[in-house]
Curated annotation (Swiss-Prot):
PANTHER family: CATION TRANSPORTER HKT1_1, POTASSIUM TRANSPORT PROTEIN DDB_G0292412-RELATED. Residues 1-70, 154-221, 312-348, 423-448, 545-552 are cytoplasmic. It comes from Oryza sativa subsp. japonica (Rice). This is Cation transporter HKT1;1. HKT transporters are proposed to contain 4 pore-forming regions enclosed by transmembrane segments with each containing a potassium channel-like selectivity filter motif. InterPro entries: Cat_transpt (IPR003445), TrkH_K-transport (IPR051143). Expressed in shoots. In roots, expressed in epidermis, exodermis, cortex, and sieve elements and companion cells of phloem. In mature leaves, expressed in large highly vacuolated cells of the adaxial epidermis, phloem and xylem. GO terms for molecular function: monoatomic cation transmembrane transporter activity; sodium ion transmembrane transporter activity. GO terms for cellular component: plasma membrane. It catalyses: Na(+)(in) = Na(+)(out). GO terms for biological process: sodium ion transmembrane transport. It holds the Pfam family TrkH. It is a multi-pass membrane protein.
Length: 552
């Protein structure tokens, strides 16, 4: 008998033996095994469903805690730390093949710098792969001021809905206003944010109609639409420009950079006010492309310094187009939303005037100091004017540059340091303190109560971190004083604290003792610091992103 036949015969004997032992015919054996398999699958399914419900319950409880009970500082700190670490892991796993990748600390530094929109660089951007650039795009989107404030608005809205569901007995936010009823002119209403305001005038509501106001939910949709529309339109505009301008397109071809990746990266970076570009020299190759610079400037302003006035303008336009009274209500009562970026009309005008005045002041100073400087050689008057305007807009928060910052005069650098120190929403005109959002007042009195004893002055904080940086870099300060001078260190700390990203860089030509192994790099001055110094700058970037909670 052949071996295969022997095996088949043995299997048949085993099957018959099992059937005899069970006192069942051969046809019943597969059915019994099938039923047992079904019971096992059902048991495992029940276990998985039970575990999934436990996980869902834990997630729901954690979400409720974050939304309703946790301090905003803790929420944002956890958010930035977790996303930064996730970005670091993604950058580490997507290293370009065939090239020596950056150190882990430099990748972590890059992730933190991108998420906090600081654009402090310790690696050369052109060394990153296309997939790593897309990771940075996601980090910039998630770290931008518009996106993070939008998440906070979602939390506020969820908290309001939760309170409404838990207190069904309370009156809802509805008004039954009759057009000819004078008794209703002095009524008060209760909003979902828990505050009472006087009723709107009769010409802003419809006759004999019940109107429900949910300002938080309405504003969530507006901010989300603003965010999505601005990012998409900015990317499309830059892509169209590179389709038209062959010279700009050739710059990317010479660097072997994908045009679409560059356009989307630049649009997101500009809107998020990060300051990174896929090029080592940032925007310097396009300093003569004044049309491109003019296209990028509105994107930078729309993502930060002028976001509040533009948001109010969007609400006003939607109200005019749709004719809905809820938009007029939001404009009249911005504090009801609890959104810090929505101000009354007067404050919005003050912000526009302050931003415009500061930009024009910078342009005047830089033109007087740098018009005939070496950094602007080869540019005509229009290119110089637009370039300096672009530089002035970026000094406040974004950090993109068409110039080598280290070649500018000391007076210009001092001006940059002062402007970087100023918060992005600072207004130099007097504003009414009563216009502060009501939710912010609650936050000041309740949420920040635990942290009030830990608040420190901004200047004291900068002095402390500068002192720590001088300690970690003391060897370089003594051996390389021209590069590691006090002003360069202070400038770097202020840039990290302001989440701007300007840097004086490092030059091998400034070494007291020439070193043949020294190579100039395009990344920032902090890239030459020790690991301890880089960790200090990471803390400064986190602190700068969260300074509104713990600094005064």
């Amino acid at each position: 008998m052949h071996p295969p036949s022997l095996v088949l015969d043995t299997l048949k004997r085993i099957k018959l033996y099992i059937a005899m032992k069970l006192l069942l015919p051969n046809s019943e054996v597969p059915r019994i095994y099938w039923e047992k398999a079904q019971h096992l699958c059902g048991f495992l399914s029940m276990k998985l469903i039970s575990r999934a419900r436990c996980v869902a319950s834990s997630v729901k409880q954690s979400y409720s805690f974050l939304v309703c009970k946790s301090n905003p500082l803790v929420v944002q700190l956890v958010y930035f730390v977790i996303i930064s670490f996730a970005g670091f892991l993604a950058l580490k796993n997507l290293k370009p093949q065939g090239k020596p990748g950056p150190k882990d600390l430099d990748l972590l530094f890059t992730s933190v710098s991108t998420l906090t929109v600081s654009s402090m660089a310790t690696v050369e951007m052109e060394d990153l792969s296309d997939r790593q650039l897309w990771v940075l795009i996601l980090l910039m989107l998630m770290g931008g001021e518009v996106f993070t404030s939008m998440l906070g608005l979602y939390f506020n809205n969820a908290n309001a809905n939760r309170n409404e569901n838990s207190q069904r007995s309370l009156p809802s936010i509805s008004l039954d206003i009759e057009f000819n009823s004078p008794a209703n002119n002095g009524d008060h209403k209760i909003t979902e944010c828990g505050q009472s305001e006087e009723t709107m005038s009769q010409n802003q509501v419809q006759q004999n109609k019940s109107i429900t106001y949910n300002p938080c939910a309405v504003l969530v949709r507006i901010v989300t639409g603003y965010f999505v529309a601005t990012v998409i339109s900015s990317s499309v505009i830059i892509i169209i420009y590179f389709w038209i301008d062959s010279d700009a397109r050739n710059v990317l071809k010479s660097k072997e950079i994908n045009m679409y990746t560059f356009c989307i990266f630049t649009a997101v970076s500009s809107f998020a006010n990060c300051g990174f570009t896929p090029l080592n020299s940032n925007m310097q190759p396009f300093r003569k492309n004044w049309v491109l610079l003019l296209l990028v400037i509105p994107q930078i302003l729309a993502g930060n310094t002028l976001f509040s006035p533009l948001l109010r303008l969007c609400v006003w336009v939607l109200g005019k187009v749709s004719g809905k009274a809820e938009y007029a209500y939001i404009l009249q009562h911005p504090g009801e939303t609890g959104y810090k970026h929505l101000h009354v009309r007067r404050n919005s005008v003050y912000i526009v005037l302050s931003v415009t005045g500061l930009i024009l002041l910078q342009v005047m100073f830089i033109c007087s100091f740098e018009w005939n400087s070496e950094s602007l050689e080869g540019m005509n008057w229009l290119q110089k004017l637009v370039g300096l305007l672009f530089q002035s807009v970026n000094t406040r928060q974004a950090g993109e540059s068409i110039l080598d910052i280290s070649t500018l005069s000391p007076s210009t650098l001092l001006l940059f340091a002062v402007v970087m120190y100023l918060p992005s929403d600072a207004s130099f005109l007097t504003a009414n303190a009563d216009n502060q959002p009501l939710t912010d007042k609650k936050t000041n009195s309740i949420s920040r109560a635990l942290w009030r004893n830990f608040t420190v002055n901004k200047l004291s904080c900068l002095a402390m971190f500068t002192f720590l940086a001088c300690i970690t870099e003391r060897k370089s300060i003594s051996s390389d004083p021209l590069n590691f001078n006090i002003f360069s260190i202070v400038f770097e700390i202020i840039s990290a604290f302001g989440n701007v990203g300007y840097s004086l860089g490092y030059s091998c030509q400034k070494l007291l003792k020439p070193d043949a192994t020294c190579k100039d790099a395009s990344y920032g001055f902090v890239g030459r610091w020790t690991e301890e110094g880089k960790l200090i700058v990471i803390l400064v970037m986190f602190l700068g992103r969260l300074k509104e909670f713990i600094l005064k």
